[in-house]
């Protein structure tokens, strides 16, 4: 981490669009870094009042406006489909030299469209902090959410090397443990497996007809661990599943094949096959860098 880069952030003006779980966490992490000038934008007045009371933002607005002309960095922490609409409204106010980024869990054409919407001299560089937690909303936000997290920088050929490096350094200043650079198309394919599928599986497991008041008394750490992410923002995740439809459906088919393989081995009393299947899973789990 470049300490000099991090210290320079303290004098920059940040605008955070969307003060939910991730947006609120950005505000708190930036304040922890010593950033003195943070603007919060959200349609929810109560959230803005709470953030002001907490001292994590200095000004609050409900819509795009002239105040954005002061922002050196704009972080869009809103639904993927809302990013381009916001940028259309914000474009007349964004100053030359500003860096604009997002946190969207599905990229698709968003990075390309957003780059066309920002004014000349400003630059949109897409990003994705892998830093969620159970629950949603500003009340669940915390500065520590980025500590040790993976951060994905998702440039297009139109991005400058300077912007890519800026976002990488910014992620490290937040406390992220690893920064990866990848194309939007590859991002969506991999995220379908590492993020979309686990959330779908957790929701399916806890939505089983077997889930009941009585079954709750038979739940241990394993069930809690596997279903933790079923405490989900249903509106956001419906969008993420549908907008990444092709990749998600492909991963669901792959998962279905694994379940059918497991089912077949149990049905055939294939102990050797089961041991091999489970041992392979244990080995793969150990390969994950935590």
What are the residue ranges of the model-derived segments?
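NAD(P)+-binding Rossmann beta1-loop-alpha1 motif at the extreme N-terminus of oxidoreductases
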Residues: 2-64, 68-69
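Short beta->alpha hinge that forms the Motif I/post-I loop of the SAM-binding pocket
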Residues: 43, 78, 103-105
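Conserved short alpha-helix immediately C-terminal to the canonical SAM/SAH-binding motif I
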Residues: 46-47, 82, 107-110
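Rossmann-like NAD(P)-binding element
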Residues: 64-99
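Rossmann-like NAD(P)(H) cofactor-binding subdomain of soluble oxidoreductases
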Residues: 88-139
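Internal alpha-helical scaffold of NAD(P)-dependent oxidoreductase catalytic cores
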Residues: 143-228
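Interdomain hinge/lid region at the active-site interface
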Residues: 213-281
């Amino acid at each position: 981490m470049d300490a000099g880069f991090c210290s320079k952030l303290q004098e920059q003006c940040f605008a955070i669009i969307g003060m939910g779980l991730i947006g609120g966490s950005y505000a708190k992490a930036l304040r922890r870094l010593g950033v003195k000038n943070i603007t919060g934008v959200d349609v929810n007045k109560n959230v803005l009042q709470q953030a002001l009371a907490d001292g994590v933002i200095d000004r609050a607005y409900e819509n795009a406006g002239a105040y954005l002309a002061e922002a050196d960095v704009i972080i869009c922490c809103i639904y993927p489909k809302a990013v381009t609409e916001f940028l259309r409204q914000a474009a007349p106010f964004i100053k030359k030299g500003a860096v604009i980024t997002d946190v969207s869990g599905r990229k698709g054409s968003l990075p390309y469209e957003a780059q066309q919407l920002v004014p000349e001299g400003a630059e949109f560089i897409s990003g994705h902090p892998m830093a969620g937690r159970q629950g949603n909303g500003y009340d669940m936000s915390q500065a520590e959410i980025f500590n040790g997290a993976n951060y994905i920088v998702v440039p297009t050929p139109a991005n400058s090397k300077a912007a890519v490096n800026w976002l990488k350094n910014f992620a490290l200043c937040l406390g992220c443990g690893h920064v990866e650079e990848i194309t939007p198309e590859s991002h969506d394919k991999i995220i379908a497996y590492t993020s979309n599928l686990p959330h779908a599986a957790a929701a399916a497991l806890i939505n089983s007809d077997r889930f009941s008041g009585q079954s709750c008394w038979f739940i241990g750490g394993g069930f809690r661990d596997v279903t933790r992410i079923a405490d989900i923002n249903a509106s956001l995740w419906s969008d993420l599943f549908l907008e990444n439809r092709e990749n998600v459906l492909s991963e669901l088919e792959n998962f279905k094949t694994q379940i059918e393989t497991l089912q077949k081995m149990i049905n055939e009393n294939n102990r050797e096959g089961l041991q091999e299947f489970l041992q392979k899973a244990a080995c793969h789990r150990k390969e994950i860098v935590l």
